[in-house]
Amino acid sequence: MREIVSCQAGQCGNQIGSKFWEVIADEHGVDPTGSYQGDSDLQLERINVYFDESAGGRYVPRAVLMDLEPGTMDSVRAGPYGQLFRPDNFIFGQSGAGNNWAKGHYTEGAELIDSVLDVCRKEAESCDCLQGFQLSHSLGGGTGSGMGTLLISKLREEYPDRIMMTFSVIPSPRVSDTVVEPYNTTLSVHQLVENSDESMCIDNEALYDICFRTLKLTTPTFGDLNHLVAAVMSGVTCCLRFPGQLNSDLRNRLAVNLVPFPRLHFFMMGFAPLTSRGSQEYRQGLSVADVTQQMFDAKNMMQAADPRHGRYLTASALFRGRMSTKEVDEQMLNVQNKNSSYFIEWIPNNIKSSICDIPPKGLKMSVTFIGNNTCIQEMFRRVGEQFTGMFRRKRFLHWYTGEGMDEMEFTEAESNMNDLVSEYQQYQDATVEEEGEFDEEEEAY
C-alpha cells in the first residue's frame, strides 16, 4: 500500500483536518469509534492509505495533530470524531504562538518539534511503503505557518525522497485576522517554495464568495467553509483511496504532471457541482458536460485569483462517479479547444484527467479540479505589496527580532517571493515563437 501520513498544525489546520477526517471516515464506512460499518468491499480495498488497522480491527487515522495551545485540540477531541484519533498523536504546548511566525518556527515551536517528529516517525514506521506527507495549515497565523514550515523542513531532511503536499490557507485580501499576516505569509511561502512538492492554496474570501453567490447562504460560518475545503481535499485524494479506471498516486498523477518547473508548485483548486445544501434534487440530473463546464468557471475557484487573468501551465481533473472515459476525454478536449488561449501551448498534453468510480456521499458524480495557473501570482503579489508597505517602515518587526530573527531573513523572503511572481509572469508571457528564438541564439554561440 502507498500510505500517506497526514499532519495538521495550528487552529485552522486542525479544524480543516478534522473535517477532512470526518468526510473520508464517512466515505470509507468508518464510524466515530473506528469500527467499520460500511457495505462495500471497495471501501476497504485501499483504506490503508489513510487508516491504520489496529489489533482489535479498529481503523485509526494516520494523523498527527499539533498546536502550541491546548484549545483547538480539546475541541477536536470533543468533536464527533474525536475518539477516532490515537491519543498519543495529539501534541500541544501551553503558551500559544500569538500569531508570531518566529515563535512557531524558532522558539516555542522548536521546543515542541522533536516530540512531533517522534510521532511522525512512529506513523511512518507502521507504513508498508510510505508515499508521503500532507500538511493542512494556514499561512497567516503563528503555529500553522511557523511550526508547519518547520515540520516540513525537518521531514524533508529525514525523508528526502517522499512527496510533501500541503493544503495552505492563504490570508484573504479583505478578510484579515491579524495585522502581521503579510509577514507570516511571506516567511512561510519562502519555506514552501523550497521544501514542498505541491501546495494547494485555499483562500477564505473565495470560500465566502462561493457560499454567498453559489450556495446562497446568507450567513456562512467557518463550518460551511471547512465543509467546502474538506470536499476538495477528499476529491484530491479520492483516486489514492479508491480503485478507478485511470488511477494515480501523489507522485505520478499530481507532482509529475502538474509541476513543469520545480518552484512553480502552487495550485488552485475547484470543485463541481456546487449547489446549496437544500437543493439535493437538482444534483441528480448532472452530466459530465455540466460538471466540466462548472469546474472551469472562475467563480468555483477556491482562491481570490482570477484564472482568466493568467494561463494554465498544467491542470488535472479528478472525476468521481460512473462515467465513460471517452465522454470525459471529449469534454476535456472541448474545453481546451474553446478556450485555447488560456492554456499554454508549449507544454503538450498539459491537462490530465482521472476517474474514480465511487462518487462522494449524496452526489451522482463530482469533479475536483487542480490547476497550475500563472494567475496565482496575483495572490503573491498582493501579499508582497502589503509586506513591503510594513517592512519599509519596520512596523511590528521587534516582535520577530525579539525571538531571535534577523532582518536579513525578511529581505530574503521578500526577494524570493518577488522572484516567484516574476517567474510566473515570464512563463505567462512566453510563446512558442520565443522558444524558437532561444534555440537559434544558442546555436549562434
From Swiss-Prot:
Dimer of alpha and beta chains. A typical microtubule is a hollow water-filled tube with an outer diameter of 25 nm and an inner diameter of 15 nM. Alpha-beta heterodimers associate head-to-tail to form protofilaments running lengthwise along the microtubule wall with the beta-tubulin subunit facing the microtubule plus end conferring a structural polarity. Microtubules usually have 13 protofilaments but different protofilament numbers can be found in some organisms and specialized cells. It is found in: Cytoplasm, Cytoskeleton. Coiled coil: none annotated. This is Tubulin beta chain. Mg(2+) binds at E69. Its main location: cytoplasm. GO terms for biological process: microtubule-based process. GO terms for cellular component: cytoplasm; microtubule. Keywords: Cytoplasm, Cytoskeleton, GTP-binding, Magnesium, Metal-binding, Microtubule, Nucleotide-binding. Belongs to the tubulin family. GO terms for molecular function: GTP binding; GTPase activity; metal ion binding; structural constituent of cytoskeleton. GTP binds at Q11, E69, S138, G142, T143, G144, N204, N226. InterPro entries: Beta-tubulin_BS (IPR013838), Beta_tubulin (IPR002453), Tub_FtsZ_C (IPR008280), Tubulin (IPR000217), Tubulin/FtsZ-like_C (IPR037103), Tubulin/FtsZ_2-layer-sand-dom (IPR018316), Tubulin/FtsZ_GTPase_sf (IPR036525), Tubulin_C (IPR023123). Its cofactor is Mg(2+). Gene3D superfamilies: Helix hairpin bin, Tubulin/FtsZ, C-terminal domain, Tubulin/FtsZ, GTPase domain. It comes from Leishmania mexicana. Pfam families: Tubulin, Tubulin_C. Tubulin is the major constituent of microtubules, a cylinder consisting of laterally associated linear protofilaments composed of alpha- and beta-tubulin heterodimers. Microtubules grow by the addition of GTP-tubulin dimers to the microtubule end, where a stabilizing cap forms. Below the cap, tubulin dimers are in GDP-bound state, owing to GTPase activity of alpha-tubulin.
